[in-house]
Design a protein with these regions (language model features):
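Bacterial Sec-dependent N-terminal signal peptides
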Residues: 1-27
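Sec-dependent signal peptide cleavage junction
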Residues: 19-60
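N-terminal post-signal-peptidase region of extra-cytosolic proteins
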Residues: 52-53, 70-85
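A short, Trp-centered hydrophobic/proline-enriched beta-strand micro-motif
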Residues: 59-74
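One face of beta-strands
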Residues: 64-66, 90, 95-99, 148-150, ...
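Solvent-exposed coil/turn segments that connect beta secondary-structure elements
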Residues: 71-73, 93-95, 102-104, 142, ...
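Mid-length scaffold segments of soluble, non-membrane domains
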Residues: 80-134
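Helix-rich interaction surfaces within compact, conserved domain-sized segments
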Residues: 124-195
Length: 195
């Protein structure tokens, strides 16, 4: 009698486990499908936001009033510094260009933020676009402490951009990587300009 009782309990337990395993597999599939659906919605939303940001950045370049807020700066020796975007930027507005660097390890500096701020008049602005939507924008900047060519590349479909500053009298180019936004939407803090 005990054997029959144990056998019956064992069979019920085994059936229950198989039902649990099947429902667990079904739940896993449903969870994966829901996760894929959420990812697709997230990707579509992100793509829409990137498209809107790209159109705003393109309009700002055409209007000549923009700021590239840099997340990192690449130096000629291969060194990359990750920096604060509101104190490291390249901007253009009202025919005036500004380039500012400021580093987190504050030391005495000309602009009071740990770096330099240079301004100058802008000339020779040119803009072109390739078939992939990448925009190439360049200009000359001439001021008391700067004489350089600035080349900006806006990546197609997003507002990610890079600006390469090539000085006219030295070969020490630096590149700012970050996001290009209209000047009015910029969150920049300007230090004291040189001279």
């Amino acid at each position: 009698m005990k054997r029959i009782l144990y056998l019956t309990i064992f069979l019920y337990t085994l059936c229950g486990m198989s039902v649990y395993a099947q429902s667990r597999g079904t739940r896993g599939k449903a969870w994966r499908l829901e996760r894929e659906r959420q990812r697709a919605v997230y990707r579509a939303l992100e793509q829409h936001q990137d498209s809107v940001s790209y159109q705003e950045a393109l309009s700002a370049l055409r209007d000549g009033s923009w700021v590239l807020e840099a997340n990192n700066i690449n130096f000629p020796n291969g060194l990359t510094r990750f920096v604060s975007s509101n104190t490291n930027y390249v901007s253009l507005t009202n025919g005036q260009g500004t380039i500012q660097t400021a580093y987190a390890n504050f030391t005495y500096s000309p602009n009071g933020l740990g770096g330099v701020t240079v301004q100058g008049n802008v000339s020779g602005v040119s803009m072109s676009q390739d078939k992939d939507g990448n925009v190439y924008y360049s200009f000359n900047i001439q001021g008391n402490a700067i004489s350089a060519v600035v080349s900006v590349t806006l990546t197609g479909g997003t507002n990610q951009a890079s600006a390469t500053i090539t000085p006219n009298f030295t070969g020490r180019t630096i590149t700012f990587d970050g996001y290009l936004v209209p000047y009015a939407q910029g969150t920049i803090f300007q230090g004291m300009p040189q001279w």
